[in-house]
Amino acid sequence: MVDYLITPTTKDDLQYVLHLFEEAIKLQNKNGYKVWNSIDQKKVKQDIENGLQYKIVIGKDIVCIFSIQYNDPFIWHNLDKNDAVYLHRIVVNQNYKGQKQFEKVLNWTVAHTIQQNRQFIRMDTWADNNHLIDYYKSFGFRFIKYYQTTDAKELPIQN
């Protein structure tokens, strides 16, 4: 088993984090997946500054990044009752694709959710991204409902 570390990203990681997003967008476009069109750099910077974006590091390589939130009222409305950790913007370094990075993210998030005294882990994705929905279901997530977000300025592009 390869040793890895999950730790908050720092402002020194910003350029590489943006590169990972750009590479993910290229791959999504190549494979025909509807997810992100561009990067909300302001939100990425906010997540880093607020300690809400994390990285998985193996050796000196950042192999995956993800963000968390403790509230997400724009997506979850009345279900947002301060009882969940919301997992967002998961990006895997393409050199480490297929090496179970999401499993590491999920294991960390389960422990963090318990540590934060919360009951649920919640995620969202595009409603027509059946491939990703099925992938998350394979880890025990349940589909809750379809919801179309507004163009609220509080929502990042990648939400």
What is each PLM-predicted segment?
Residues 119, 126-129, 139, 146-159:
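C-terminal "cap" of GNAT-fold acetyltransferases
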Residues 92, 98-111, 137-138:
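Conserved acetyl-CoA-binding loop-helix of GNAT-fold acetyltransferases
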Residues 78-94:
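Conserved acetyl-CoA binding element of GNAT-fold acetyltransferases
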Residues 4-19:
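A short beta-loop-alpha structural element at the N-terminal edge
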Residues 22-45:
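Conserved GNAT-fold acetyl-CoA-binding loop/helix
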Residues 61-72, 86, 91:
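Conserved beta-strand in the GNAT
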Residues 45-55, 86:
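A short helix-loop-beta-strand connector motif used in the catalytic cores of GNAT acetyltransferases and
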